[in-house]
């Protein structure tokens, strides 16, 4: 277990929990110091055994499980903080490890929280008793003897209050030591077991890809496989200053390149593969961008840059020291050593899911979860089955290409991504349908579409005051009657008086010549507005009097395409937001 330094207690006591960070408290029910120390040693040894036996191939997304034995407020215990990064599965893998270790050490009580608080209760929100929720669950949720338990208040208290207050750390430790009111819910534990049933097999999920990288990187990864995540994160969160290191590549230069298999996790591979970047100066990529060599070279370039950024980062001095220590261990792998590594490319089709397919996959997953939950309910919530049931290899571990080249995958993806004439017509049709649907919405409750009956006293008095001021300012001016329905009809061109009139008859005047009398009705106001708006549009679009529907569609698509091309990131900005809301996927290739 890693040492967290002398400030572990200060960080644990802090109310601020960083994003993607989980905190762990492990207390023991023994009252004698010698017995507690023995239980601590046994618990840490069991965690180490579990990781060696079940997670030997696991690659941590950010930090590995960090725990430290401390004496806190006169009580020997284990405290820990781990930042699991972007991989939520790492957090649940930690939960699985702690749950399994608690089975071996019966006196252990484990608490784990993150920025959401008691996230174990969030997972089992539908199964909680009425007297506990997220507001009063502090220090009440623990893992003990392989089960999630809740520190329950006294029955007399619940009869009076119907819900329990949150606990302090001291109160929770006292109740743990006494062993009283430990509430266990089969439904809560079933929900947690459902979430954990894919472990430990899911902990060893990996994705292998062929990359062209410096020989030094192969050597470093052979010494510590978890440095792959540090390098990918360094490239993924790079800034313009970091990219200056990539233009020099002083540590991982491109003079000694090898093509070999690199092991990622699916998440790390997706983060690296989908990162967009320029071709940095030290790199000479193949000219054929659709070739297999280009794919391997561009992936290797990104990984090499990640290691270069990691090595030069002032925030990761310990990583620099670690890399230097590995590189001092000679010799580097020879060409014969590299040839012994089998060239394997795992399936990456999981990244080629369009939005429509994603909804279908999520629905299938939800239905599968509901079926599993129903089976468990009918079987009496057999927790033993949950603990020992693992997700099949074919579900969790990406399979091999089976001889299929990356070129075929690239061609298939580009066929999905390129826009053609029918795609453009479909896009225009969806936008037109959306506008027509919005324009024809007659199901309104009032002018603003909402009822404003629930206004407070201050708002009412303010409104009355405004009305009085308005009336005083407009004394002597005739009241203008406002017909809301007629106003909407005028906006939509449905008013019989003007529906068949040619708009051209209003185009002769300009803004300076308009004279709206004080007693004008709403129709005259609308005529004046039409005249002003039409005159401005006519002057701006003088050469487009003969525009037809096809020209409108063409102009619409022209503006959309120009907006896409002007946006450096196709997955952000107003055009992308508009098209995504209409379920129109933007191609990666312009």
Curated annotation (Swiss-Prot):
Give GO terms: molecular function aspect only.
snRNP binding
UniProt entry tagged with the keyword Transcription: yes
Q: Which GO terms describe its biological process?
A: mRNA cis splicing, via spliceosome
The GO cellular component terms are: cytosol; nucleus
Question: Pfam families from the entry?
Answer: SGT1
The organism's place on the tree of life at top rank: Eukaryota
Q: Where is this region: Disordered?
A: 445-464
Localization recorded for this chain is:
Cytoplasm; Nucleus
Keywords on record: Cytoplasm, Nucleus, Transcription, Transcription regulation
Task: Tell me the function of this protein.
Answer: Involved in the regulation of carbohydrate metabolism. May act as a transcription factor.
Instruction: Please give the family membership noted in the entry.
Output: Belongs to the ECD family.
What protein does this entry describe? Answer: Protein ecdysoneless homolog
